[in-house]
């Protein structure tokens, strides 16, 4: 999701908007492609920065908008699904290949189950947060149409191309497939 004190529906709506980012190079690139001015800022400073106009908007998860009360200082939130937050479990390949096959299989199964479980919790928390934000009446939620999503994807396509060189096309293709994106 992304927010501001104006609707962010079309890529042109971002022109000149100061948007708080966490420092992600990908976020920096795609916001610049939208015409925004990314501002790296600590998470703990975001509420006050939104309240005082140091930044015009930010991106975050629905649960963070609710718990951090960002919706109280932003008139408009776009439920955009423009970014995907993921975490990786990384293990040394020599260590991994040294484990017996049955142990690797059990660990993979446990990771799959843990991933499914935590994803279900995140989905529920975010759905509940959106309902609470809407119920508060303090901000307007905007949901993008398929055509609007396509316009965002087109505007951010150079970032997708750039990221291919960093993480590889197969990884991004898998992500696009999982998120049902047309890239």
What are these regions (language model features)?
Residues 1-183:
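N-terminal secretory/targeting leader peptides
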